């Protein structure tokens, strides 16, 4: 009888009320009885096993919210600082500097460049051509006459000639330089022509000269022919040179 009454007493609504009264506000808590304490521990274990995922999720959510919120606030607060604003405006300035570096010829096309004392146009190596000086016939005659007298002019002479002809000293200097270069080319061409004519005259003289008389031929095969040729060659000079035998015969007679 007692065994059956204990489960009923456990399942009775009174014991359930005693258990739920433990979760009331702290000022209204009552001193628990031994029976209610046992029910409270069992209920806590049962409820903790079922409510553990919810507790973990709630704790994670509670931790995630404060962590995310100060991070956003820190970013928003730092965005108003001058350092962040300067960093945010840096890509625009970098792209502008890059566009200037990619197009370096924009400024060079508008200006002339002087390199090595030579005036260049657009920086592409094209020289600005000066206008060509046109000399009159009277000026050319006077310059040619002076060039026949001397090929090099001193500074006073050049200044005097330029003033008399209405030219600048630079124009007179350039004309004399060009005239000297042309004169040297003509001299070189004339020297080559003289050498060619001398060679032609030498060949003509060698062709008109008499033939050389044939001498002794060492390559002749017959001894008779060689003796005859030597005999014909030697007697022609015996009249000029006396033989050694005749000189030996004359010496005993004198003694």
UniProtKB/Swiss-Prot annotation:
<keyword id="KW-0539">Nucleus</keyword>
<dbReference type="GO" id="GO:0048706">
    <property type="term" value="P:embryonic skeletal system development"/>
</dbReference>
<keyword id="KW-0805">Transcription regulation</keyword>
<feature type="region of interest" description="Disordered">
    <location>
        <begin position="1"/>
        <end position="38"/>
    </location>
</feature>
<dbReference type="GO" id="GO:0000981">
    <property type="term" value="F:DNA-binding transcription factor activity, RNA polymerase II-specific"/>
</dbReference>
<dbReference type="Pfam" id="PF00046">
    <property type="entry name" value="Homeodomain"/>
</dbReference>
<dbReference type="GO" id="GO:0042475">
    <property type="term" value="P:odontogenesis of dentin-containing tooth"/>
</dbReference>
<keyword id="KW-0678">Repressor</keyword>
<dbReference type="GO" id="GO:0048715">
    <property type="term" value="P:negative regulation of oligodendrocyte differentiation"/>
</dbReference>
<keyword id="KW-0221">Differentiation</keyword>
<dbReference type="GO" id="GO:0007219">
    <property type="term" value="P:Notch signaling pathway"/>
</dbReference>
<dbReference type="GO" id="GO:0048709">
    <property type="term" value="P:oligodendrocyte differentiation"/>
</dbReference>
<comment type="similarity">
    <text>Belongs to the distal-less homeobox family.</text>
</comment>
<feature type="DNA-binding region" description="Homeobox">
    <location>
        <begin position="128"/>
        <end position="187"/>
    </location>
</feature>
<keyword id="KW-0238">DNA-binding</keyword>
<dbReference type="GO" id="GO:0021879">
    <property type="term" value="P:forebrain neuron differentiation"/>
</dbReference>
<dbReference type="GO" id="GO:0043524">
    <property type="term" value="P:negative regulation of neuron apoptotic process"/>
</dbReference>
<dbReference type="InterPro" id="IPR000047">
    <property type="entry name" value="HTH_motif"/>
</dbReference>
<dbReference type="GO" id="GO:0030514">
    <property type="term" value="P:negative regulation of BMP signaling pathway"/>
</dbReference>
<dbReference type="GO" id="GO:0021766">
    <property type="term" value="P:hippocampus development"/>
</dbReference>
<dbReference type="GO" id="GO:0005634">
    <property type="term" value="C:nucleus"/>
</dbReference>
<dbReference type="GO" id="GO:0005829">
    <property type="term" value="C:cytosol"/>
</dbReference>
<dbReference type="GO" id="GO:0014016">
    <property type="term" value="P:neuroblast differentiation"/>
</dbReference>
<dbReference type="GO" id="GO:0021893">
    <property type="term" value="P:cerebral cortex GABAergic interneuron fate commitment"/>
</dbReference>
<comment type="function">
    <text>Plays a role as a transcriptional activator or repressor. Inhibits several cytokine signaling pathways, such as TGFB1, activin-A/INHBA and BMP4 by interfering with the transcriptional stimulatory activity of transcription factors, such as MSX2, FAST2, SMAD2 and SMAD3 during hematopoietic cell differentiation. Plays a role in terminal differentiation of interneurons, such as amacrine and bipolar cells in the developing retina. Likely to play a regulatory role in the development of the ventral forebrain.</text>
</comment>
<feature type="compositionally biased region" description="Basic and acidic residues">
    <location>
        <begin position="100"/>
        <end position="112"/>
    </location>
</feature>
<protein>
    <recommendedName>
        <fullName>Homeobox protein DLX-1</fullName>
    </recommendedName>
</protein>
<dbReference type="GO" id="GO:0051402">
    <property type="term" value="P:neuron apoptotic process"/>
</dbReference>
<dbReference type="GO" id="GO:1902871">
    <property type="term" value="P:positive regulation of amacrine cell differentiation"/>
</dbReference>
<dbReference type="InterPro" id="IPR009057">
    <property type="entry name" value="Homeodomain-like_sf"/>
</dbReference>
<dbReference type="GO" id="GO:0045746">
    <property type="term" value="P:negative regulation of Notch signaling pathway"/>
</dbReference>
<dbReference type="InterPro" id="IPR001356">
    <property type="entry name" value="HD"/>
</dbReference>
<dbReference type="GO" id="GO:0021892">
    <property type="term" value="P:cerebral cortex GABAergic interneuron differentiation"/>
</dbReference>
<dbReference type="GO" id="GO:0071773">
    <property type="term" value="P:cellular response to BMP stimulus"/>
</dbReference>
<dbReference type="GO" id="GO:0003682">
    <property type="term" value="F:chromatin binding"/>
</dbReference>
<feature type="compositionally biased region" description="Low complexity">
    <location>
        <begin position="217"/>
        <end position="232"/>
    </location>
</feature>
<dbReference type="InterPro" id="IPR020479">
    <property type="entry name" value="HD_metazoa"/>
</dbReference>
<keyword id="KW-0804">Transcription</keyword>
<dbReference type="GO" id="GO:0000977">
    <property type="term" value="F:RNA polymerase II transcription regulatory region sequence-specific DNA binding"/>
</dbReference>
<keyword id="KW-0217">Developmental protein</keyword>
<dbReference type="GO" id="GO:0003677">
    <property type="term" value="F:DNA binding"/>
</dbReference>
<dbReference type="GO" id="GO:0045597">
    <property type="term" value="P:positive regulation of cell differentiation"/>
</dbReference>
